[in-house]
């Protein structure tokens, strides 16, 4: 398997992101990045990002959660952030992403979890608590849905799928500025830091495929 690993210097001095990186070996030889802030014995806020973002999305929420007495674990899905990026688009199945989060929860033995999820972090993350009920206590759900795979896809989703498939070299910084005009140029560039070339972006084309949506029927 050919795997991209974004150089560490791409993540140097990102605005508002002073957190130390942590890594978990998962899915064979692949390396998943996650943030781990706060007391290790505290209840956990497990923060799952969407696309095309990464754990940088939670940079302002992490200090607030820690100040409230929580341990914050914020992984980057494979293909995003500082996590490894397999070049083969077929790798990025729904189960691949879901299983990687389950493996991280088990490896860190996370308990008393509040699932904090947004966008695809919710579509993936919301299928997990019912299989691990003794580990989860609360949900904080933002801008997402619990997909069942049997409802017609919304116009917004179809528009995003068409857009992402037609823009293999998508300008992530410009996209984020359009979505959140208040972002500084440095913050917008930070969202784009993990993605160096076209093969880095195959993950979100796969995520929005009809096959992925149909997989949600199982849950």
Positions of PLM-derived features:
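Flexible "cap/lid" subdomain of the alpha/beta-hydrolase fold that forms the substrate-access gate
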Residues: 1-21, 32-39, 44, 57, ...
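C-terminal active-site-capping segments
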Residues: 24
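Glycine-centered tight beta-turn/hairpin loop motif at sheet-sheet or coil-to-beta transitions
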Residues: 27-31
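Structural cue for short, hydrophobic secondary-structure segments
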Residues: 47-50, 74
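The serine-hydrolase catalytic nucleophile loop
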Residues: 51-62
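Short hydrophobic signal-anchor/transmembrane segments that target glycosyltransferases
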Residues: 64-66
């Amino acid at each position: 398997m050919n795997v991209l690993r974004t150089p560490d210097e791409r993540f140097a001095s990102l605005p508002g992101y002073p957190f130390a990186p942590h890594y978990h070996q998962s899915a064979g030889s692949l390396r998943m990045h996650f943030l781990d802030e706060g007391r290790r014995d505290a209840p956990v806020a497990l923060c799952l990002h969407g696309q095309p973002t990464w754990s940088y999305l939670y940079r302002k929420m992490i200090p607030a959660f820690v100040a409230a007495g929580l341990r914050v674990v914020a992984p980057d899905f494979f293909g995003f952030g500082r996590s490894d990026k397999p070049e083969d688009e077929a790798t990025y199945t729904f189960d691949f992403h879901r299983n990687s989060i389950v493996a991280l929860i088990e490896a860190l033995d996370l308990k008393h979890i509040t699932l904090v999820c947004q966008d695809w972090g919710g579509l993936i993350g919301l299928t997990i608590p019912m299989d691990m009920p003794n580990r989860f206590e609360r949900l904080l759900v933002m801008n997402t849905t619990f997909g069942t795979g049997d409802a017609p896809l919304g116009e917004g989703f179809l528009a995003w799928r068409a857009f992402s498939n037609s823009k293999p070299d998508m300008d992530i910084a410009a996209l984020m500025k359009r979505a959140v005009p208040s972002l500084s140029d440095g913050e917008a560039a930070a969202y784009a830091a993990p993605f160096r070339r076209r093969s880095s972006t195959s993950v979100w084309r796969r995520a929005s495929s009809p096959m992925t949506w149909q997989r949600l029927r199982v849950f």
